[in-house]
Amino acid sequence: MIQWFLKYRPRSLKDVENQDGAKKELQEWIESWLNGKPNAKAVLLHGPPGVGKTTLAEALAHDYNLELLEMNASDSRKLQDIKSVAEKASVYGSIFGTRGKLILLDEVDGINVREDTGAIQGILELIEKTKYPIIMTANDPWNPALRELRNKTKMVGLNKLGKYPLRRLLKKICQAEKIICDDEALNYIIDTSEGDARYAINMLQGIGEGYGKVTLDLVEAMARRKERELDPFETLRDIFWARYAWQAKNAATSAQIDYDMLIRWISENIPIQYDNIEDVWRAFDALSRASIFLKRAKGGDWDLLSYAYDLMSSGVAAAEIEKKKPNWKPKWKKYQFPSYIQLLSKSKDIRDTRDEIIKKLAIHSSFNKTLNDTYPFFLIFYKKYDKRLSLNTKEKEYLNSASKS
């Protein structure tokens, strides 16, 4: 099922509310390009999350019959990724019969200048050589890393969506989706969204689809939930109970634990949640694919991390075929800690004793080098050195046991 903020996104500039100044600036800029005398090669659209930066760029392309060549700059981390956009724009003709192309680089403030070496420089080169107009978006345009980009672009700021336009939009969605929403609940959503239309629509959809109606109690409960990270048990429940991909993905990305530990939690509890053996197989298949993407991401191709999250959340949630039935209801199950964590907890005292021995050995070497190179041989002839190392009774007992195993 498509997310409502995408389903009800304005297609044309005339449908974009509360952004008259930005629309006028963009229209003048794109017309200067179409007339062959661009007043700026690139525009930096900036404003808070959910105000419609990407929507405005897409509406501009629609109204002027331009093919939109879109890339998320914070996901495309390599210089080559940025350069490939220029190559595609320059070499390949449009297959849609449009007048030209519009390049959109989303979330340029999400680029990590330390990890994403060359990305900013790649964008600057793209701006310098481009044959087509470029729009970039950013929540925080004053990030020091974007200083050179600011100097090379036309800055266009967007306003937060006002309460009245947001109310009209939410009421329109409720009517179209046949959702009953109390006025108090609607006011609460509008107030807490603070002009973020995407947040407001997602909250409306999350409650409306789950309960069939939107009340103040439900909205307040969901708002409190969004203000904090989910503990592992809540994360599992939201993933396993999700009927839509975006619900499972939101749960995974809001978890208190990192992706490595989340995979362990999900793996441990798949057989608990799913009764059908085929559902279990499909869930583990998705999780194994997530592990593959995660390993490749750690190898430096961090673009693949998003696929890992999709598979470990949406892929696992979609494993239960019964969810497709209209009368499906989630089953409450008692989840458990990963056995891996339990084993680590039980062995902590043993590992602490071992580490104390290694610290005594590692006088002229690092801990890890001593652990890997010296410690295995030390177990063979440790009795000759126990007095010199001042080993206590507990450490001697550990060595006696370890040397026999």
UniProtKB/Swiss-Prot annotation:
Report the record's Gene Ontology biological process terms: DNA replication
Keywords of the record, alphabetical order, are:
ATP-binding, DNA replication, Nucleotide-binding
Question: What SMART domains does UniProt report for this protein, alphabetically?
Answer: AAA (SM00382)
CDD domains per record: AAA, HLD_clamp_RFC
GO molecular function (one): ATP hydrolysis activity
Which InterPro entries does UniProt cross-reference here?
Answer: AAA+_ATPase (IPR003593), ATPase_AAA_core (IPR003959), P-loop_NTPase (IPR027417), Rep_factor-C_lsu (IPR023935), RFC_lid (IPR047854)
Q: Is Nucleotidyltransferase there in the keyword field?
A: no
Q: Name one Pfam family in it.
A: AAA
Task: Cite the binding residues for ATP.
Answer: 47-54
Q: Which HAMAP family match?
A: RfcL
The entry assigns this protein to a family as follows: Belongs to the activator 1 small subunits family. RfcL subfamily.
Q: Which PANTHER family match?
A: CHROMOSOME TRANSMISSION FIDELITY FACTOR 18 (PTHR23389), REPLICATION FACTOR C SUBUNIT 1 (PTHR23389:SF6)
Its biological function? Part of the RFC clamp loader complex which loads the PCNA sliding clamp onto DNA.
Assembly and interaction partners: Heteromultimer composed of small subunits (RfcS) and large subunits (RfcL).
Q: What is this protein called?
A: Replication factor C large subunit
Q: Which organism is it from?
A: Saccharolobus islandicus (strain M.16.4 / Kamchatka #3) (Sulfolobus islandicus)
